[in-house]
Amino acid sequence: MVIDGQQRLTTVSLLLLAMYNLMKKGIVVPAKASLGEQIYETYLVDKWQDDDTRIKLKPVKNDKEAFDRLFGDEADYIQESNLTSNYKFFYERIQKEEISVSELYDAICRLEIISITLNQDDNPQLIFESLNSTGVALSEGDKIRNFILMGLPSKEQTDYYEKYWNKIEQCTDNEVSLFVRDWLSVKQQVTPAISRIYYTFKQYVYDEKAETEDLLSDLLSYAKRYKVLLHGDRCNKNLNACIARLNRLETTVTRPFFLEVLRLYDDRKLTIDEVTTIFLTTETYLFRRSICDLPTNTLNKIFLTLHKDIVRLDGTEDDYVAKFKYVLLSKKERARFPSDNEFAEAFASRQIYQMNSKNKVYVLERLENYGTIEDKDIYSAC
């Protein structure tokens, strides 16, 4: 297991592979004819291994397939992969022959590598944090992944990565840091600063004495709900349309609350129609506040504690929709839900064209499509 330096190893491997493929095709010619085979057999493959294990570099699952295909026909490359993009950069740059392929290989051979082997009792996570503290910062999500998986035996690492972590990354569109921030908000009713997500997560795990698989299972459950908030995949057209509109308004402060609403749906405490009602009511609340020019800096706290405020009314999650509406309508002053009269008066005098772009287009789209059988695509024209 490599604790630190995976990106450097991957970059050098892509460079060497681009050099090898260019020499193999005769596009560039080295000073020594055997250089291509030397690179291939020394750095890229172990020819004594079976076909499925002979490639030396073993990236994570999604990247592994992309890297492996670079050894074959270009038609089979995974074009949307960052590995493929980086490989193609090297492939095209080498052909300019700003330096010869032989000179490039000599430069690679002068790279210095420090190898530190840990003892059985050493803590790889602490070593990693120490090494990474002065390097290029990893994302908070990367640190969390390493914190969860790094101390496990190799087989468990692989199993948990495949069963949980890879799926979490896919569900969150690889925005694990932001997802975990919302997950922590659900768990603690406090939103950590972006730079403190990892440390807040680590402290939470220590405080809760969470078992690794239980932790990953819970994260995956919430990640699946997070996917709904990103893309909408419930069988309700109105809900999906509402989610799309909220995302265009970039109302991310609602996500901790919506994650709990979707949990209640998964627990069969809410129907899909009730979930849709909650989302649409929230959309109305946000839109009315925007038209009435109420401050947005109160929204984070409102939605952070909204689920807890609802449950506090009678100590249960029963009759959730009615209690949700009651709590919102009970908000006062800067947190209030504007009445019909307040909204109508504000809308009549609001300078819509002076609103920020996302809110302005939202208003125009709603005026155009509300109550129609077939929606017109307003957003692509704006």
Model-predicted segments: where are they?
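Glycine- and hydrophobic-rich flexible loops that cap the catalytic core of alpha/beta enzyme folds
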Residues: 1-195, 296
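Generic low-polarity alpha-helical segments
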Residues: 2, 12, 100-103, 110-111, ...
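Histidine-centered nuclease catalytic patch
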Residues: 5, 362-366, 372-382
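Short helix-capping/linker segments at secondary-structure and domain boundaries
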Residues: 22-26, 135, 263-272, 369-375
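Short, Φ-rich (hydrophobic/aromatic) sequence segments
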Residues: 83-97, 219-229, 364-367
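Generic recognition of flexible, low-complexity loop/linker segments
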Residues: 100-103, 113-114, 242-248, 377-378
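A cross-family structural signal marking well-folded subdomains
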Residues: 112, 141-361
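Short low-polarity hydrophobic stretches
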Residues: 132, 258, 282, 380-381
